[in-house]
Protein backbone atom coordinates (compact mmCIF):
# COMPACT_ATOMS: atom_id res chain seq x y z
CA UNK A 1 0.00 0.00 0.00
CA UNK A 2 2.83 2.40 0.83
CA UNK A 3 4.25 1.81 -2.65
CA UNK A 4 1.04 3.31 -4.09
CA UNK A 5 2.37 6.72 -3.03
CA UNK A 6 5.23 6.28 -5.48
CA UNK A 7 2.82 5.15 -8.20
CA UNK A 8 0.68 8.23 -7.63
CA UNK A 9 3.77 10.43 -7.75
CA UNK A 10 4.85 8.94 -11.08
CA UNK A 11 1.41 9.45 -12.60
CA UNK A 12 0.88 12.98 -11.24
CA UNK A 13 4.48 14.19 -11.16
CA UNK A 14 3.89 17.90 -11.63
CA UNK A 15 4.09 21.00 -9.49
CA UNK A 16 0.30 21.39 -9.39
CA UNK A 17 0.17 18.54 -6.87
CA UNK A 18 0.71 19.79 -3.32
CA UNK A 19 -0.24 16.91 -1.01
CA UNK A 20 -0.64 13.15 -1.00
CA UNK A 21 -3.28 11.90 1.44
CA UNK A 22 -3.66 8.30 2.59
CA UNK A 23 -6.70 6.94 4.47
CA UNK A 24 -8.67 3.73 4.88
CA UNK A 25 -11.89 2.88 3.07
CA UNK A 26 -13.85 3.09 6.34
CA UNK A 27 -12.72 6.65 7.04
CA UNK A 28 -14.94 9.71 6.73
CA UNK A 29 -13.00 12.74 5.43
CA UNK A 30 -14.28 16.31 5.77
CA UNK A 31 -12.73 17.79 2.66
CA UNK A 32 -13.36 21.50 3.32
CA UNK A 33 -11.56 21.29 6.64
CA UNK A 34 -8.79 19.16 5.15
CA UNK A 35 -8.13 21.70 2.39
CA UNK A 36 -8.06 24.56 4.88
CA UNK A 37 -5.66 22.68 7.14
CA UNK A 38 -3.24 21.89 4.33
CA UNK A 39 -3.29 25.55 3.35
CA UNK A 40 -1.62 26.41 6.66
CA UNK A 41 1.47 24.39 5.70
CA UNK A 42 4.06 25.00 2.97
CA UNK A 43 3.92 22.01 0.61
CA UNK A 44 7.39 22.87 -0.72
CA UNK A 45 8.86 21.84 2.64
CA UNK A 46 8.98 18.37 4.21
CA UNK A 47 5.76 17.68 6.12
CA UNK A 48 4.28 14.46 7.47
CA UNK A 49 0.91 15.28 9.05
CA UNK A 50 -1.41 12.93 10.92
CA UNK A 51 -2.20 11.66 14.39
CA UNK A 52 -1.54 8.73 16.64
CA UNK A 53 -4.17 6.59 18.34
CA UNK A 54 -6.38 7.76 21.20
CA UNK A 55 -5.49 4.46 22.87
CA UNK A 56 -2.26 4.16 24.84
CA UNK A 57 -2.39 0.39 24.27
CA UNK A 58 -2.44 0.78 20.46
CA UNK A 59 0.42 3.27 20.48
CA UNK A 60 2.52 1.13 22.79
CA UNK A 61 1.89 -1.92 20.58
CA UNK A 62 2.80 -0.14 17.32
CA UNK A 63 4.29 3.34 17.72
CA UNK A 64 3.69 6.66 19.45
CA UNK A 65 5.37 8.45 16.53
CA UNK A 66 3.30 7.06 13.66
CA UNK A 67 0.51 8.75 11.74
CA UNK A 68 -2.22 6.12 11.77
CA UNK A 69 -3.39 5.32 8.25
CA UNK A 70 -6.96 4.75 9.35
CA UNK A 71 -7.23 8.29 10.66
CA UNK A 72 -5.45 9.46 7.52
CA UNK A 73 -2.12 11.17 7.04
CA UNK A 74 -0.72 13.62 4.50
CA UNK A 75 2.71 13.94 2.93
CA UNK A 76 3.79 17.18 1.28
CA UNK A 77 4.86 17.13 -2.35
CA UNK A 78 8.42 17.97 -1.36
CA UNK A 79 8.59 15.01 1.02
CA UNK A 80 7.15 12.55 -1.51
CA UNK A 81 9.57 13.85 -4.13
CA UNK A 82 12.45 13.16 -1.75
CA UNK A 83 11.08 9.71 -0.86
CA UNK A 84 10.39 8.67 -4.46
CA UNK A 85 13.93 7.66 -5.37
CA UNK A 86 14.40 5.79 -2.09
CA UNK A 87 11.01 4.21 -1.55
CA UNK A 88 11.81 0.74 -2.94
CA UNK A 89 14.93 0.49 -0.81
CA UNK A 90 13.06 1.79 2.21
CA UNK A 91 10.29 -0.78 1.82
CA UNK A 92 12.92 -3.50 1.59
CA UNK A 93 14.69 -2.12 4.64
CA UNK A 94 11.51 -2.18 6.71
CA UNK A 95 9.83 -5.25 5.21
CA UNK A 96 9.59 -6.74 8.71
CA UNK A 97 7.08 -4.03 9.68
CA UNK A 98 3.56 -5.34 9.22
CA UNK A 99 1.74 -2.01 8.83
CA UNK A 100 2.14 0.24 5.78
CA UNK A 101 1.63 3.37 7.89
CA UNK A 102 4.48 2.22 10.14
CA UNK A 103 6.69 1.90 7.05
CA UNK A 104 5.65 5.41 6.02
CA UNK A 105 6.68 6.78 9.40
CA UNK A 106 9.99 4.92 9.31
CA UNK A 107 10.88 6.12 5.80
CA UNK A 108 10.01 9.71 6.71
CA UNK A 109 12.09 9.44 9.88
CA UNK A 110 15.08 8.36 7.76
CA UNK A 111 14.89 11.81 6.17
CA UNK A 112 14.67 13.45 9.60
CA UNK A 113 10.95 14.19 9.27
CA UNK A 114 8.82 13.62 12.38
CA UNK A 115 5.06 13.37 12.59
CA UNK A 116 3.23 16.67 12.91
CA UNK A 117 0.13 15.87 14.97
CA UNK A 118 -3.19 17.55 14.12
CA UNK A 119 -5.91 17.02 16.74
CA UNK A 120 -8.81 17.16 14.28
CA UNK A 121 -7.70 13.84 12.77
CA UNK A 122 -9.26 10.87 14.59
CA UNK A 123 -8.15 7.25 14.52
CA UNK A 124 -11.18 6.38 16.70
CA UNK A 125 -9.66 3.47 18.60
CA UNK A 126 -12.48 4.09 21.06
CA UNK A 127 -16.19 3.48 20.88
CA UNK A 128 -18.85 5.69 22.39
CA UNK A 129 -19.65 9.37 22.69
CA UNK A 130 -16.58 11.45 21.96
CA UNK A 131 -17.02 14.55 24.10
CA UNK A 132 -13.32 15.37 24.05
CA UNK A 133 -13.02 16.75 20.52
CA UNK A 134 -10.62 19.72 20.60
CA UNK A 135 -11.21 23.22 19.27
CA UNK A 136 -9.76 22.16 15.93
CA UNK A 137 -11.56 21.56 12.63
CA UNK A 138 -12.84 18.00 12.31
CA UNK A 139 -10.73 16.35 9.59
CA UNK A 140 -11.49 12.63 9.78
CA UNK A 141 -13.35 9.89 11.65
CA UNK A 142 -12.20 6.29 11.30
CA UNK A 143 -13.78 2.87 12.04
CA UNK A 144 -17.32 3.86 11.09
CA UNK A 145 -18.02 0.25 10.14
CA UNK A 146 -17.21 -0.94 13.67
CA UNK A 147 -17.82 1.73 16.31
CA UNK A 148 -21.16 2.30 17.97
CA UNK A 149 -23.43 4.63 15.95
CA UNK A 150 -22.89 8.21 17.08
CA UNK A 151 -26.66 8.74 17.16
CA UNK A 152 -28.34 6.16 19.43
CA UNK A 153 -31.62 5.99 17.49
CA UNK A 154 -29.89 5.28 14.15
CA UNK A 155 -27.71 2.59 12.62
CA UNK A 156 -24.20 3.31 11.36
CA UNK A 157 -25.09 4.35 7.81
CA UNK A 158 -28.01 6.47 9.02
CA UNK A 159 -25.69 8.14 11.54
CA UNK A 160 -23.19 9.07 8.83
CA UNK A 161 -25.92 10.53 6.61
CA UNK A 162 -27.32 12.47 9.56
CA UNK A 163 -23.90 13.86 10.48
CA UNK A 164 -23.33 15.03 6.92
CA UNK A 165 -26.42 17.27 7.02
CA UNK A 166 -24.74 20.00 9.10
CA UNK A 167 -21.46 19.30 7.28
CA UNK A 168 -23.10 20.55 4.07
CA UNK A 169 -23.70 23.91 5.75
CA UNK A 170 -20.52 24.44 7.74
CA UNK A 171 -17.80 21.88 8.43
CA UNK A 172 -15.72 24.31 10.50
CA UNK A 173 -18.11 24.09 13.48
CA UNK A 174 -18.82 20.37 13.25
CA UNK A 175 -18.25 18.45 16.51
CA UNK A 176 -17.29 21.65 18.33
CA UNK A 177 -20.24 22.17 20.69
CA UNK A 178 -19.88 21.02 24.26
CA UNK A 179 -21.36 22.94 27.18
CA UNK A 180 -20.08 22.27 30.68
CA UNK A 181 -20.90 24.20 33.84
CA UNK A 182 -17.56 23.62 35.55
CA UNK A 183 -14.41 25.65 36.14
CA UNK A 184 -12.63 25.93 32.79
CA UNK A 185 -9.67 23.77 33.82
CA UNK A 186 -11.95 20.95 35.00
CA UNK A 187 -13.92 21.12 31.75
CA UNK A 188 -10.75 20.12 29.88
CA UNK A 189 -10.92 16.75 31.64
CA UNK A 190 -13.78 14.96 29.92
CA UNK A 191 -15.74 12.19 31.65
CA UNK A 192 -15.09 8.88 29.84
CA UNK A 193 -18.43 8.44 28.06
CA UNK A 194 -16.62 5.99 25.76
CA UNK A 195 -14.58 2.83 26.12
CA UNK A 196 -11.19 1.71 24.78
CA UNK A 197 -10.97 -0.27 21.56
CA UNK A 198 -9.40 -3.25 23.30
CA UNK A 199 -9.47 -4.47 26.88
CA UNK A 200 -6.39 -3.38 28.78
CA UNK A 201 -5.34 -1.94 32.10
CA UNK A 202 -5.57 1.79 32.75
CA UNK A 203 -4.47 4.34 31.80
CA UNK A 204 -6.43 3.92 28.59
CA UNK A 205 -6.39 7.22 26.70
CA UNK A 206 -3.98 9.77 25.27
CA UNK A 207 -5.97 12.72 26.66
CA UNK A 208 -7.16 13.93 30.04
CA UNK A 209 -10.19 12.21 31.56
CA UNK A 210 -11.91 12.23 34.92
CA UNK A 211 -13.99 9.50 36.50
CA UNK A 212 -17.73 9.43 35.96
CA UNK A 213 -19.69 10.65 38.95
CA UNK A 214 -23.16 9.99 40.37
CA UNK A 215 -23.24 13.55 41.63
CA UNK A 216 -26.17 15.23 39.80
CA UNK A 217 -24.11 18.43 39.61
CA UNK A 218 -21.47 16.60 37.56
CA UNK A 219 -23.47 14.05 35.53
CA UNK A 220 -23.77 15.01 31.83
CA UNK A 221 -27.02 15.92 30.08
CA UNK A 222 -26.70 14.63 26.51
CA UNK A 223 -28.39 16.24 23.49
CA UNK A 224 -28.12 14.93 19.93
CA UNK A 225 -28.43 16.62 16.55
CA UNK A 226 -32.00 16.62 15.28
CA UNK A 227 -32.07 19.03 12.32
CA UNK A 228 -30.24 21.88 10.63
CA UNK A 229 -31.61 24.66 8.42
CA UNK A 230 -30.42 27.95 6.95
CA UNK A 231 -32.66 30.89 7.78
CA UNK A 232 -32.77 34.54 6.78
CA UNK A 233 -35.63 35.37 9.13
CA UNK A 234 -33.43 36.07 12.15
CA UNK A 235 -33.11 39.84 12.13
CA UNK A 236 -31.07 41.06 9.16
CA UNK A 237 -28.66 38.14 9.08
CA UNK A 238 -28.46 34.76 7.43
CA UNK A 239 -27.82 32.11 10.05
CA UNK A 240 -27.59 28.35 10.33
CA UNK A 241 -29.97 27.00 12.96
CA UNK A 242 -28.96 23.65 14.42
CA UNK A 243 -31.43 21.90 16.72
CA UNK A 244 -30.45 19.38 19.39
CA UNK A 245 -32.85 17.28 21.46
CA UNK A 246 -32.35 15.38 24.69
CA UNK A 247 -31.51 11.73 24.18
CA UNK A 248 -33.36 10.55 27.29
CA UNK A 249 -35.63 12.09 29.94
CA UNK A 250 -33.91 14.38 32.40
CA UNK A 251 -34.57 12.25 35.47
CA UNK A 252 -31.45 13.14 37.44
CA UNK A 253 -31.85 14.47 40.99
CA UNK A 254 -31.85 18.26 41.14
CA UNK A 255 -28.44 19.83 41.56
CA UNK A 256 -28.58 22.55 44.21
CA UNK A 257 -25.11 22.64 45.75
CA UNK A 258 -23.62 25.00 43.17
CA UNK A 259 -26.52 27.44 43.13
CA UNK A 260 -27.45 26.72 39.50
CA UNK A 261 -30.97 25.65 38.53
CA UNK A 262 -31.58 22.12 37.29
CA UNK A 263 -31.17 21.40 33.57
CA UNK A 264 -33.82 18.67 33.70
CA UNK A 265 -36.63 20.81 32.17
CA UNK A 266 -34.55 21.52 29.05
CA UNK A 267 -35.44 19.26 26.12
CA UNK A 268 -34.19 21.27 23.15
CA UNK A 269 -31.18 23.46 22.35
CA UNK A 270 -31.11 25.76 19.32
CA UNK A 271 -27.70 26.94 18.14
CA UNK A 272 -27.54 29.97 15.82
CA UNK A 273 -24.27 30.37 13.90
CA UNK A 274 -23.24 32.71 11.06
CA UNK A 275 -23.92 31.26 7.62
CA UNK A 276 -21.42 33.50 5.84
CA UNK A 277 -18.15 32.67 7.55
CA UNK A 278 -16.21 29.63 8.68
CA UNK A 279 -14.96 29.36 12.24
CA UNK A 280 -11.29 30.25 12.42
CA UNK A 281 -9.20 27.16 13.09
CA UNK A 282 -7.70 26.98 16.56
CA UNK A 283 -9.92 29.74 17.95
CA UNK A 284 -12.90 29.48 20.23
CA UNK A 285 -16.17 31.31 19.64
CA UNK A 286 -18.21 33.05 22.30
CA UNK A 287 -21.94 32.77 22.75
CA UNK A 288 -25.00 34.39 24.25
CA UNK A 289 -27.33 31.98 26.02
CA UNK A 290 -31.01 32.81 26.31
CA UNK A 291 -33.21 30.76 28.62
CA UNK A 292 -36.53 31.63 30.22
CA UNK A 293 -37.25 29.76 33.45
CA UNK A 294 -39.93 27.14 32.96
CA UNK A 295 -39.38 26.82 29.20
CA UNK A 296 -38.01 23.64 27.60
CA UNK A 297 -35.76 25.33 25.00
CA UNK A 298 -32.41 27.10 25.24
CA UNK A 299 -31.18 29.43 22.48
CA UNK A 300 -27.44 29.76 21.93
CA UNK A 301 -26.11 32.45 19.57
CA UNK A 302 -22.50 32.03 18.42
CA UNK A 303 -20.30 34.96 17.47
CA UNK A 304 -16.67 36.01 17.40
CA UNK A 305 -15.28 36.73 20.85
CA UNK A 306 -14.90 40.37 21.80
CA UNK A 307 -11.57 41.68 23.02
CA UNK A 308 -10.95 40.46 26.55
CA UNK A 309 -13.48 37.60 26.44
CA UNK A 310 -12.10 34.24 27.53
CA UNK A 311 -13.04 30.96 29.18
CA UNK A 312 -13.57 31.51 32.89
Q: What are these model-predicted stretches?
A:
Residues 1-312:
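Secretory-pathway lumenal glyco-enzymes, predominantly type II signal-anchor Golgi glycosyltransferases
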Amino acid sequence: MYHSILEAFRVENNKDVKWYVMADDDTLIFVDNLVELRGTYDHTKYYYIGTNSESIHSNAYISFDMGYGGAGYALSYALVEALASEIDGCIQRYKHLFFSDYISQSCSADLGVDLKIEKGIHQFDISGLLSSHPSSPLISLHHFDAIDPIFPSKNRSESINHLMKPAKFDQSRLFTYLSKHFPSKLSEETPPTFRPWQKSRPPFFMFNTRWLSNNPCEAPHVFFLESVIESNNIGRYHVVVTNYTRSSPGNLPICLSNGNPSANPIHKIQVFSPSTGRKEAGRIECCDVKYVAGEDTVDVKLSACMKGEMLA
